[in-house]
UniProtKB/Swiss-Prot annotation:
Residues 102-111 have a biased composition (Acidic residues). Residues 90-127, 273-299 are annotated as: Disordered. The keyword Thylakoid does not apply. GO terms for cellular component: nucleus. Keywords: DNA-binding, Nucleus, Stress response, Transcription, Transcription regulation. Plants over-expressing BHLH148 display drought tolerance. May act on an initial response of jasmonate-regulated gene expression toward drought tolerance as part of a BHLH148-TIFY11D/JAZ12-COI1A complex. Pfam families: HLH. This is Transcription factor BHLH148. Residues 127-140 are annotated as: Basic motif. GO terms for biological process: regulation of DNA-templated transcription; response to water deprivation.
Length: 299
């Protein structure tokens, strides 16, 4: 039988060396031989098999040229160690492959979040790079617009390149500062002319009062003419008429003594009253005409 020949060859060659205690089941046995029950042997055959020994005599190494027994497993001259390793490899191949597959699946499951994180990191980096690119583009656009506006103001004296625009703008700003300083000085001069005096020149205040003047306007004109004849400049005049009394105050610039200015004003007022039509009355007039004047230094 095929099973007996297989076990006989295995016991003779391999089982005694690798499995001293028991003989393992062979993975190469057909399923039908294992599942189907063997027919019961005849009594004579059973007695003969009972007398047979479990061991066979060793007849020496089988030569390569000798024919193999019917149903025996031939080794083909292969080393026993290699055969055993091949058998064990075939027996453990399925389990090892399964363990390897599970390990690969676990590694792949662990790599999925890492890939996702790497993908998210790449997205963040790409978005940051995009925002940086947009900000840089906006900055360059603003800079170009500023150069264009500056060139519009200095186009007559500048070339189109940026260095010429900046240099021309700097020169133009310096010229504007010089012009501003000149205008400020001119403004101060005009203010001094409007005020009508030089701050270095002394100033005095002339005050006079006239009771019942014949003509207040004539009195004022006469006083101003007399001051003009003395090269005296009037800075300001303030006058008021209360009842029959004329009160006048003048601020004048003069280098003449204050007493001389006072005498000149009094003489001018007296001359106005003499020239009036009713000047037949003895001076200072029957109308009780009186005049007083006062000069005080302001500066």
């Amino acid at each position: 039988m095929q099973m007996e020949s297989y076990y006989g060859a295995f016991h003779a060659d391999e089982a005694a060396f690798f499995f001293p205690h028991h003989v393992p089941a062979s993975p190469e046995l057909p399923f039908g031989l294992i599942a189907s029950p063997e027919p019961e042997p005849e009594p004579e055959q059973a007695a003969a098999e009972a007398r047979q020994s479990a061991f066979q005599e060793y007849g020496g190494a089988v030569h390569a040229g000798a024919p193999a027994a019917a149903g025996a497993v031939t080794t083909g001259g292969t080393n026993i160690h290699r055969r055993v390793m091949d058998v064990l490899g075939r027996m453990g191949g399925g389990g090892g492959g399964g363990e390897k597959g599970e390990g690969e699946e676990m590694e792949e499951e662990e790599e999925v979040p890492q890939r996702r994180r790497r993908g998210q990191g790449a997205d963040v980096e790409s978005s940051r790079g995009f925002r940086h690119m947009m900000r840089e583009r906006q900055r360059r656009e603003k800079l170009s617009q500023s150069y264009a506006d500056l060139y519009a103001m200095v186009s007559s004296r500048s070339k189109g390149d940026k260095n010429s625009i900046v240099q021309s703008a700097a020169i133009y700003i310096h010229e504007l500062k010089v012009a501003r300083d000149q205008l400020q000085r001119r403004n101060e001069e005009l203010k001094a002319q409007i005020m009508g005096h030089d701050e270095q020149q002394p100033c005095v205040t002339v005050q006079f009062e006239v009771d019942e003047p014949s003509s207040s306007i004539d009195s004022m004109i006469a006083a101003l003419r007399r001051l003009k004849g003395m090269s005296v400049k009037a800075r300001g005049i303030r006058s008021s008429m209360s009842g029959n009394r004329l009160w006048t105050e003048m601020n004048v610039e003069t280098t003449i003594a204050a007493c001389e200015v006072e005498k000149a004003v009094e003489e001018a007022l007296k001359e106005v009253e003499r020239n009036q039509p009713d000047s037949d009355a003895p001076f200072p007039g029957s109308k009780g005409w009186t005049q007083t004047s006062h000069v005080q230094n302001v500066f």
